[in-house]
Amino acid sequence: MDDKWIPVTEPLPLEKRQLEGMKVDVLLSPYDVPEAVRGFIRKDHKVFLIEFKYISQEDTIERPQSEHVKLRVGRNSGRLYAIELDLQKFGANHVQLRLEVAEALKNVLTHLVKEPVSPMRATNYKMAKKVVENHEDCILQPI
């Protein structure tokens, strides 16, 4: 396992909201923004795992997303801590595998943003998607 974390350098995003007829900018909590991300293959289980590290850590629970995708979210916060992709689903060569995993990862994150596991963490899921998009080459390097 490559446990090298990739530092996340994205600035805290502003989210524009309408409150009682006024437009306001809401800053995402630094506790919801990953500090680092990593991707690696768990060879014993033939799983590609993408993990997110935050300022504070907590116990996680597993949430199946589909037959071949599992999410690990914070037990109390609902923050996204990991995405597990079952590599046995992909019966492709090395180059094709990387493309298929990248596509599956984008689909999982897009679905998570549209239908959040925890509606209160929708901005955390958007930030996780942005982090993965910005660091995709490094995250998928083990494949």
Predicted regions located by residue number:
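Short, solvent-exposed aromatic-acidic interface loops
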Residues: L85-G91
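Residue-level recognition of conserved beta-strand positions in structured domain cores
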Residues: F52, E84-L85
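Intrinsically disordered terminal and processing segments
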Residues: M1-K70, R75-N76, G91-I143
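Hydrophobic "anchor" residues
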Residues: R79-L80
